[in-house]
Amino acid sequence: MESTITIENVVASTALATEFDLVKIMDSGLEGAEYNKTKFPGLVYRIDNPKAAFLIFTSGKVVCTGAKTINNAHKAITNLANKLKDIGCDKINLEPEIHVQNIVASADLKTTLNLNTIAIAFGLENVEYEPEVFPGLIYRVEAPKVVVLVFSSGKLVITGGKCEEDCNGGLRIVRKEFDNLGLLC
């Protein structure tokens, strides 16, 4: 049975302005915003539709995290840009260039795995497995450049992709490698 990925998190960044006055943004009554520069240099702002969280910095740069799709990350950033304009922020870029920094996806191979066997079969080149430190096997895929965390339950976490196809490619490679080793039913 073919496994499919589920996107769990998309992290994207952009520049919405050349600078932000974070205190002014807080004072404008941006509902749900948190800013304490002694704890963190950015303002944290969360929205529900689409669900996402933002880190907003004085440099005008913004990081969006928590979106479940690339499209939702774009929508969330566009909504934020309009909200910042509405509360009086100057020179907001309403059509910013958005860069996906990381996609985290999950998958289930629907079989249990012996991670010791996999670690021995793969050697030390692209694999790390230290069960005393971390219960998963870390498999670094060269192309696409992703990291796949493999758990004995057969569950996978794929991280480092810049697009959905990177994550799918990582899953295909892992499935093929495990199938070649006779590990998949």
UniProtKB/Swiss-Prot annotation:
Keyword terms: DNA-binding, Repeat, Transcription, Transcription regulation
State if DNA-binding is listed as a keyword: yes
Instruction: Name one molecular function that GO assigns to this entry.
Output: DNA-binding transcription factor activity
Q: Where are the sequence repeats?
A: 7-84, 100-178
Q: Which domain of life is it from?
A: Archaea
Question: What GO biological process, any one, is recorded here?
Answer: DNA-templated transcription initiation
Pfam families, alphabetically? Answer: TBP (PF00352)
Is ATP-binding one of the keywords UniProt gives this record? no
Entries under HAMAP family matching the protein: TATA_bind_prot_arch
Which NCBIfam families does the record associate with it?
PRK00394.1-2, PRK00394.2-4
Q: State its role.
A: General factor that plays a role in the activation of archaeal genes transcribed by RNA polymerase. Binds specifically to the TATA box promoter element which lies close to the position of transcription initiation.
Which family is this protein grouped under?
A: Belongs to the TBP family.
| Entry protein name | TATA-box-binding protein 3
